[in-house]
Amino acid sequence: MTESVLDYMSRLGRDARAASRLLARAATAQKNRALLAAADALDAARAELSHANEQDLAAGRANGLEPAMLDRLALTPARIDDMIEGLRQVATLPDPIGEIRDMRYVPSGIQIGKMRVPLGVVGIIYESRPNVTIDAASLCLKSGNATILRGGSEAIHSNQAIARCIQQGLAEAGLPAAAVQVVETTDRAAVGALISMPEYVDVIVPRGGKGLIERISREAKVPVIKHLDGICHVYIDVAADLDKAIRVADNAKTQRYAPCNTMETLLVHAGIAERALPPLATIYREKGVELRGDAATRALLGADVLEATEEDWRTEYNAPILSIRIVDGLDAAIEHINTYGSQHTDAIITENFSDARRFLAEVDSASVMVNASTRFADGFEYGLGAEIGISTDKLHARGPVGLEGLTSEKYVVFGDGHVRT
């Protein structure tokens, strides 16, 4: 690359800004045509995708990437199938752009409503998973946003191969190539440039490790949609149905360990602990989950439960490790969650309607649940289609961010020669 990284990123930004204006007025049928053509291009380019991905995997093995990272990096035939299906699914989703709602007349006689519009240009910064390229590009395209995608250097060849398929889809639909751009330099200065261009980029969505997200949150000069941690809780109330409690607490921890909506701390009311914890501990031990507990939990379950420290209550393990605390009641459970949680997803298991309503009202998280596993905190499960990420922020988008989270609203006003007096 002969131009400087800053000049290169500025060029991408200018092109994306110009493309965003065209995308904002693109017809739904045209956007869907691009998505479906990109899906067909991916299907036809399976050999090319596999070859590019093998280059990344070989480099990753040579550089000592951990097996878990290599697994996330791999584009298996099944994952290519999922990417193709993902594009086709997004094409079937309702287009939010241009929708006008809440139309009403006001005393002056004018009619006022709100129109849903794209954000503009979305910068996506992510690590490892090449499939994020498809998730992000498809949602941004359908919602009328241009996007600049900066994937991890370990996936550069895979991302470029995927981008070529997306570009083919854009071309077939008559949409600008700059609607979806993949950063082709692995220079880390590109990240700093991308998050520092408010004249070109309207929002940044980081997906990756805590260090990356903290850096972007600290240094970005444009708004950021993010979540730092997934410290999710399940609280088993004294009025819980025991079968439901065991089923949910098992699933919330052991269905998968790595996702950000996996339970990391189990809270149990002292009045039900002797009935709920022993059978749960048996399940966890059979599945190889390491248990850490407070003094009451260790006294009940035995010495093989490790002592939970203050740090455990604040830790997202992403591993078969679970912290357990026995609490005196709902007040203590809510206090624990609001003190140690990450405002991601928390659940109560109870048959007491008043306790459920209090939990929903007082737990300060993006998703709060009653008698359901935290693993449901996902755009697909919420009926949003794909998601671009999960936000624990309180401004703009909160929770799983799908198409609507990539839009904003503007007021539209209709009059008939009205003037203000």
UniProtKB/Swiss-Prot annotation:
Pathway: Amino-acid biosynthesis; L-proline biosynthesis; L-glutamate 5-semialdehyde from L-glutamate: step 2/2. It comes from Pseudomonas aeruginosa (strain UCBPP-PA14). This is Gamma-glutamyl phosphate reductase. Keywords: Amino-acid biosynthesis, Cytoplasm, NADP, Oxidoreductase, Proline biosynthesis. HAMAP family: ProA. It comes from the Bacteria. It catalyses: L-glutamate 5-semialdehyde + phosphate + NADP(+) = L-glutamyl 5-phosphate + NADPH + H(+). GO terms for biological process: L-proline biosynthetic process. The keyword Oxidoreductase applies. GO terms for cellular component: cytoplasm. GO terms for molecular function: glutamate-5-semialdehyde dehydrogenase activity; NADP binding. Belongs to the gamma-glutamyl phosphate reductase family. InterPro entries: Ald_DH/histidinol_DH, Ald_DH_C, Ald_DH_N, Aldehyde_DH_dom, G-glutamylP_reductase_CS, Glu-5-SA_DH, GPR_dom. The keyword Mitochondrion does not apply. Its EC number is 1.2.1.41. Catalyzes the NADPH-dependent reduction of L-glutamate 5-phosphate into L-glutamate 5-semialdehyde and phosphate. The product spontaneously undergoes cyclization to form 1-pyrroline-5-carboxylate. Pfam families: Aldedh. Its main location: cytoplasm. CDD domains: ALDH_F18-19_ProA-GPR. The gene is proA. It is found in: Cytoplasm.
